[in-house]
């Protein structure tokens, strides 16, 4: 035991020495707000920040007051929100210096209500990338109009490219003055305000060199300070910030995100890691898992198995590790109204949160309320408590235990029962230096957690959190609805039709985040042209479907792929004027991968020759090869190492959903074979060609999307090559 303690003291000394070597933190108004390695100090008082994520843009303003009231009721002292650029600047400005399209009225009203009416501090996260399962990850769709022809990163957005930074400055110059007016340092003593502003978001998941990320962060910090931001700036899951000695970046601090599901003990170890990596700032969890989002075709968040035990355990284990700031993400999820959710996201953003989408409360709300009660009682003491070493009896293999001690000697013993089925009920003996051994009887249900508070002053001990009773609220059951009559109403296609130039996207004409738009054209054809043309081919800005009507009749899609916007119109055309109407369905803007950078709408369309039905080629074999392909025939004759895959629509859709949800890393046929590394993958398949297919010219093969370079071989002969990112690839294989 003595040897162990000696080792720990040496480690602590080295830990403190490392902290002293880092640049000292500078604060604009340290008497109003500052922080050290332990906690935030606001107006001279150490504070444990317990925050609730609540997005003002996901709930009608008429319901804000109800949600704030319940947040306050649960014991929170802070609320956090993302601030989406595309929500506040929906229409493309004339230039980078034009801020006339920005509207911050709802943000200002939300901040005012939080600060003045409910006495809550606020944390704001303006991105520009926010993720949040939100359209474009917060970027306006019109920003894609300014995408440079060349850039050396996987994405243009989020990068250090001058064009991106120019528009990032535009956004910060617009929104930061709003923050500046509402920050704590501009308020009277005792009033509430913004206490933190985040730069970027989860930068660890963006593929760019650290030096370039640091360049971005330095510029963003300057955009904030130049616009009057005086409260602390922070990042989220950005390793470049932790322990930085850079003059600017060292003045930021990084927070952790914790989505550990039922591995709740990791909440403790992750905080301990954060404190080692960043010894001069408080250990804060920016996103303490409050549930999970739902995707189209998957389960709903409200059916989540992450119950009150999970919400309670996440908080207590983070505290056991030394966290003095927790933000439940989400505490209230809300709704993706009017198509604002990212592609594949459901309208519901309930998130399985403690405060339901409808505003209802449950046992999970009661569990979080118990955490809030505990923080309100002991938060100030916990804020400067220290982890202490201890040993116990050997009967705790299914428990994760942490012990913290205040300067006054009060002990906090945190316990989590990792067993999924069996409750722990037994005496545990604790040995702590300078104290006589003592026994604690622990009764903890499976996957549940508790904290024992032992007061040094009076020798009393008590378990927390206390069980909370939910207030009785009136329940109005919905009245039954019976459909007595239904009528059909055909679209008349009357409206404000506008001329459209080829290659002009919807955002460029002021159409933003609208689910459906209509295109209309009248084409005059001769009798000869009617006999020649039989297809309508539409090129889109992004992978969205069209639905086409020609002369009042629905045109069938040429393939089973609903995103292949080629239509068979043979028999629908006639001599003279032909009316073609297309309904464009906006499936939503992606929120973190390449389509995030694409405009929306139809780019171009044209009539094509008649063609027979498209035959999907779904079954393939694939394998990775070490070197460039030189002898294709010998390579194909080797039947070892090939894996059969399906490139059908349902498989790809399901894999994409898994990838977005982050539930597992799927064996994505095109993207994961090389596992993100340079190399060569070979795909092979067999096609049974009939004489009829050859005579009718059914010899065009189209790949909807090929990334990087590719070469097509048919019967051992090279017939075509491709060298582009994320673009279709069409070749004639008749030769």
Predicted regions and their residues:
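An active-site-proximal structural segment forming one wall of the substrate-binding cleft
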Residues: 103-125, 149-194
